[in-house]
A protein has these predicted regions:
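Active-site-proximal flexible loops/turns
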Residues: 1, 27, 106-112, 144
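Conserved AMP-binding/adenylation subdomain of ANL enzymes
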Residues: 1-41, 56
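Gly/Ser/Thr-rich phosphate-binding loop
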Residues: 6, 11-14, 40-45, 54-121, ...
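Thr-Gly-centered strand-to-loop micro-motif
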Residues: 19-21, 74-75, 136-138, 153
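Short, glycine-/Ser/Thr-/acidic-enriched flexible segments
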Residues: 22-24, 49-50, 79, 115-117, ...
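Well-ordered alpha-helical segments embedded in enzymatic catalytic cores
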Residues: 30, 49-52
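Hydrophobic face of alpha-helices
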Residues: 50, 84, 151-153
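Conserved ATP/PPi-binding loop(s) of AMP-dependent carboxylate-activating enzymes
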Residues: 126-128, 141-160
């Protein structure tokens, strides 16, 4: 999926910044060094990386000026509510933080960020366009305001 996003970005004239290596080596802030130096505007990462960065005690906000950074997108697993707090206090206060859900198998996002909506701690902001998605409990019933499985209930326009 990231390949498709990168190809689309390149077609629009965007400059991509990629890192090849361990995201916490040689030090926990190596990706933020790169983001600062390259004036990254949108930083894509994983929920696990943000949790590990917090565990390492990195105070990015205190050590890195990131004036170009407008948004951080997190994927790979649900972003813990504590990670929202960490980004808001120790990475870049006021940055748009979007937890997204989708994947390689669908080449799309079921849910993603939206700059017109507020960011809520521990929540996905909105469904992707054309996505019929519900949360189901263990019995296979649609639930609202409860934890469960994210289920796509109908085909969607960009379905592979």
């Amino acid at each position: 999926m990231m390949w498709n996003w990168m190809a689309s970005a390149l077609a629009l004239g965007v400059t991509l910044v990629l890192y090849d290596g361990h995201p916490l080596h040689p030090e926990a802030t190596v990706l933020w060094d790169m983001a600062r130096d390259e004036r990254v505007t949108v930083f894509g990462t994983s929920a696990r990386y943000l949790a590990l960065l917090e565990k390492a005690g990195a105070d990015v906000a205190a050590t890195h000026a990131l004036p170009a950074l407008r948004a951080i997108c997190s994927t790979g697993s649900p972003l813990a509510p504590e990670s929202y707090d960490y980004v808001a206090t120790r990475v870049k206060p006021g940055v748009r933080l979007s937890s997204i859900s989708g994947g390689t198998d669908i080449v799309s996002c079921f849910a993603l960020g939206n700059p017109a909506l507020p960011v809520r701690r521990g929540a996905l902001q909105c469904l992707g366009l054309g996505m019929a998605v519900e949360v189901w409990d263990d019995a296979g019933h649609s639930v609202v305001g409860e934890a469960g499985e994210l289920v796509c209930t109908r085909p969607f326009p960009s379905m592979p």
